[in-house]
Amino acid sequence: MIKTVAVGTDGSDTAAKAVEFAIDLAERYEAKIVFLSAYKAASDSSQKRESRDAPEDVQWQFSNSEDVDPALSDAEESAKERGLDATTEAKEGEPSKVLVELAGKHNADVLVIGNKGMDRKVLGSVPNTVSHKAPCSVVIVKTT
């Protein structure tokens, strides 16, 4: 039985597909959904400018918590509009470590993430690491 679905998001198009999949899954099982994100505090505005030009999978490195808040809020609102019990959490750190840690913290039964990586031909490093270290089942959504 699935009671809690966790999903990693950063607001990217790839993450949006994983979020939609996770919302559908939570709705089907009448489960709670937790939207998770990782960020690294930006030390100056030049890093924020650089983040706009960076590939999606590394943009988190230039973000701060304020940058991930809209993605989490939008996802939470979408879930609540469909009648789901939804919460969010963001934490500073490397995405795969943060997702694994927070999935465990929230006692997730399943963790949903997108498949897109830096090299568009192979599974991304975050989903690859998460699939090996997560404390729960992992669903990797094909987004490309």
Each model region followed by its residue ranges:
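Conserved beta-strand positions in the Rossmann-like core of class I SAM-dependent methyltransferases
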Residues: 34, 87, 139
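Short glycine/serine/threonine/alanine-rich loop segments
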Residues: 31-32, 84, 108, 136
